Structure formats: C-alpha cells, structure tokens
C-alpha cells in the first residue's frame, strides 16, 4: 500500500502553512540562506517505522536542494539507536521543517508500533486487527496507512465503503430486520451490510435478516463464543468496544474474525524519533 503523492502534498503543504506561516522568526534571522547542513532521523525506542516518505517530503517541498539517504523503509522494525535516514540541505530549511516532519513520522510510527503489538498478541488465532473511522480529521489516509504498516487491516475508509447499521440507524428504521430489508432494496450487489448488536437476540435477528458482518458491541467473552457458533458459515463476526491489550488475546480466542480497535488511531502514543 502506497500513499498517492498528490494527496500527501496537499496535506503536507497545509501542515507547513500551519507552522511556518510567512516567516520563521528564529531561522530566517539567524541562518544565512546559503548555509548548508546535515541531520539524522534517529530512533529513540524500539518500534515500527511509518511515515518516512511523508516526513522527507516536508523538506523536499521546502528546499529543492534537499537530499536524503534512507536506511529503513516503512514497516521496518526499529531498535533504539537505529539511524533511519540522513538528511542534507539548507540549514534554515532543515530547521523550518523539523517539527512538522517529526510530528508526522512520530504519529504514524506510533500507530504502526501499537498495531504491531496488537497483531502479535493475536498470533495463532483466526482474528484480524482492524482500525475504525475514529481518526483525526484530515489525517485518515495517513493513519490508516500506518495501521497497514503495522500489520493490521483497514475497516471502512468512509461512509460509502459499506453499510454499517448502528443502534441509532436501527432505532430510526424500526428494527434490525426492517433496516436490512430497506437497504437490500436500494444497495448494489457489491455493498455488504454490517449490523451492530448488543445481545444474542439481536445477533440471531441480524443473521436471519441476512447481514454479512455482525459486530458484537461490548459483549462478554461467553456471549462472543455463542455468537461465533451461531454465525458459523453465515456471517463474519467483529468484536468491538472497550478492548484493551490485556483483553485482546481472550477476545481473539473466542473465534471472532475481526477485532476493531479505535484506540489505534484516536489516542495512540507518538513513537520517539529525534532529528539531530
């Protein structure tokens, strides 16, 4: 999976405008414009790299003379002390782009690292780790790319990717069966329907109505096991809601197909990378 450069450039230019505006009152007054410098991206912890091309693109857009030597690629496992890349170009431009570049690569690597940890915890089970739409506005493509770099899979990218009936949709439509029936009459054959359920009665109704994917929202492990047995061969089962690293393995061992974790994108810790 690669991010289109035209998309990256729009996002990066916006990030640069946020930080630099029209002048850097430190670098522009201290550093001669023709002074050249070098720097390194250095891993300060163990983790998974993501966002290197995005970070380097910050400097490319600021400085036509910028050059970089890469020692790692997105998806690589990093150890503390690893040199990720060496940078060279205008000293002033390296300083101007430093914070924006680090914000992006640290955030994306944090997501990839957290995802890789979750994926390791479910090894040997049937479950896949996915993200959600709980992403930061404007950063969804970068965040979902980072999940893939960490070994996870993407859930819906946006509301047009598939139909997901949550409790509010179901209540507004007059129940699970009626909601699925209404959608089936309007959706194309390529669009799957997922239904959020809160108990086994709702699981049974969703199965009978023909849902392809059933989400188990905050259900107990015992209820998950029963839902998996009920759905066998009929629908995929997704577990979601309040799942932590401590509960991840037991949830996976219930036999669910998918475990979606919003925390991978909405509250992940940044990965420590320095630029010196």
Q: Model regions: which residues?
A:
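Cys/His-rich Zn2+-binding cysteine-cluster or related metal-binding knuckle/ribbon modules and their
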Residues: 245
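Short secondary-structure boundary segments
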Residues: 218, 241, 263
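Acidic/glycine-rich phosphate/pyrophosphate-binding loops and surrounding catalytic core
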Residues: 1-198, 202-209, 213, 222-230, ...
